[in-house]
Amino acid sequence: INKDCLLPMDVGRCRARHPRYYYNSSSRRCEKFIYGGCRGNANNFITKKECEKVCGVR
């Protein structure tokens, strides 16, 4: 699995409300979260499909 996918979900420090997806290593699924728009980490994908492709979800 891509190491970025193992990072914890991080909403970032800003207050925008961007719908994004992250890989939840506990459920082994890509799940929706609201991204604040800045900072955060690499476990942050614009689409569920992109998250699933990068993180190897089947």
Swiss-Prot record:
It is found in: Secreted; Nematocyst. One of its GO terms (molecular function) is potassium channel regulator activity. Residues 5-55 form the BPTI/Kunitz inhibitor domain. Keywords: Disulfide bond, Ion channel impairing toxin, Nematocyst, Potassium channel impairing toxin, Protease inhibitor, Secreted, Serine protease inhibitor, Toxin, Voltage-gated potassium channel impairing toxin. The keyword Aminoacyl-tRNA synthetase does not apply. GO terms for cellular component: extracellular space; nematocyst. Pfam families: Kunitz_BPTI. Disulfide bonds join C5-C55, C14-C38, C30-C51. The record marks R15, A16 as: Reactive bond for trypsin. SMART domains: KU. Dual-function toxin that inhibits both the serine protease trypsin (Kd<30 nM) and voltage-gated potassium channels Kv1.2/KCNA2 (IC(50)=1100 nM). Belongs to the venom Kunitz-type family. Sea anemone type 2 potassium channel toxin subfamily. This is KappaPI-actitoxin-Avd3c. It comes from Anemonia sulcata (Mediterranean snakelocks sea anemone).
